[in-house]
Regions:
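Small-residue-biased structural context
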Residues: 1-148
Length: 148
């Protein structure tokens, strides 16, 4: 699996979790789903920031996009921390979760459809993307083993 396919799969998994969270009225269940979302996003951000973005920054025409994505990561991480610290019955929990959903979906859409991924497909060889995919998979598995 190449790097872009792996990152797309991560985006889809989180999107499914968002739908699951939005589909339940049970606040404790919603908090449980949020913790799963938090874990998925932490792993995803870590592999993007340590493996994917550094590889993409080698291409001059991608540097601004990478910087923008890193800024979005900072905002998303701050929001994750805020939500994590809220009790599930807090009146702010649902509204902050909704903002998180919107921010992450915007970030994924920007990467996949509008800007980054299409440009990467033009710039990088399939061999480079496959190699990067393997590196991302290794980093992801390492992160998940640490979390267990």
């Amino acid at each position: 699996m190449d790097a872009l396919e792996l990152l797309h799969e991560d985006h889809e998994k989180v999107k499914e979790l968002f739908e699951e969270a939005e589909g339940t009225e049970n606040q404790k269940e919603k908090k449980r789903i949020f913790e799963e979302i938090n874990s998925e996003l932490e792993t995803h951000a870590r592999i993007e920031e340590t493996v994917f973005y550094p590889a993409m920054q080698k291409h001059q025409e991608l540097k601004d996009m990478v910087r923008e994505s890193l800024e979005e990561h900072k905002q998303i991480k701050a929001l994750l921390k805020q939500i994590h610290n809220l009790k599930s019955d807090s009146e702010k929990f649902d509204s902050k979760l909704q903002v998180l959903i919107e921010d992450v979906e915007h970030h994924a859409e920007e990467e996949e459809e509008r800007k980054m991924f299409p440009k990467i497909r033009k710039i990088c060889s399939q061999e480079e993307l496959d190699k990067l995919g393997t590196e991302l998979e290794t980093a992801k598995n390492k992160k998940q083993r640490k979390a267990s």
